[in-house]
Swiss-Prot record:
Residues noted as binding sn-glycerol 3-phosphate in the record, renumbered to the chain: 107, 135, 137, 190, 243, 253-255
Residues at which NADPH binds: 13, 33, 107, 139, 254, 273, 275
Protein name: Glycerol-3-phosphate dehydrogenase [NAD(P)+]
Pathway: Membrane lipid metabolism; glycerophospholipid metabolism
Active-site residues from the entry: 190
UniProt keyword annotations, A-Z: Cytoplasm, Lipid biosynthesis, Lipid metabolism, NAD, NADP, Nucleotide-binding, Oxidoreductase, Phospholipid biosynthesis, Phospholipid metabolism
GO biological process annotation, one example: glycerol-3-phosphate biosynthetic process
UniProt source species: Brucella ovis (strain ATCC 25840 / 63/290 / NCTC 10512)
Amino acid sequence: MSTKIAVLGGGAWGTALAAMAAKGGHESWLYARDAETVVAINKDRRNPCYLGDITLADGIRASTDAAAVVTGADAVLAVIPAQAMRNGLSELGTLIPQASPIVLCAKGIEQNTGRLMSEVVAEILPDHRIAALSGPSFASDVARGLPTAVTVACEDANTADRLAALLSGPAFRCYSTTDLKGVETGGALKNVLAIAAGAAIGRGYGASAQAALVTRGFAELRRIGQAMSARPETIMGLSGLGDLMLTCSSSQSRNYSYGLALGRGEDLTSRPLAEGVATAPIAAELCRKHNISAPIIDAVGALLDGKITIDEAVTALLNRPLKTED
């Protein structure tokens, strides 16, 4: 029986997920606003704006008609930036059949409300099943069919299991969980920590400082996860520790690259805004609300606000009172 996977969003990640679905033998539909992108994908098997050096699988069908893309879909992957998710699904959500679970593929916290993506979408589409896909995965790797493992989360266990089975393919392995908020928390907060890791390398502090920031940053992530009722195994898993390791160590990460540029003192005005920039102040406020010690996240927020320099941030972190390791 043929299965259909619909992808909303013609950027790098949306294109990669559509390619993954096609390689898995599914009927893969991709919605993009740009007509030229749609023509190029259908005719040349390439997205001229993203991943242009990768030939895409033949099974992808791109369209500017969102209704045609989502009709009859066994799953709808919403690959919309976190800060645009509310508007995007307010516009497109009414087209999505209620029987089709919506899989959120953006990692972030809404800036104005402090809500996770699943909470935002639940307000807009309260009658739909909502899931999230997260884990250590770069779009170029997935589009090329390189081995990748991620987590699919939905509060309904049967839906989580079905989605994991549906989305898993020859080189794309999905683990299922019902810990939706835990998966989203790890995916959002690792972006902030990646900026810190990139800034340390960009400033020339070296790999030892990078390792310390990532490790102590993970301790902050665990504390926040506990306050958010995330399961420990979720934070220790692919969507937590796994994603943190990848994002904090590769220039393919937009957040890490942003931190690198920040550390080098480069002009950031023309650089695409990393999701961690929007998440940092929200994460810092979340920690204050729950009385969580998160000095690295606090430092990133202050750094991005221009309140301190990188050198001042590192000095302050090193001069904190000594304590036992947690």
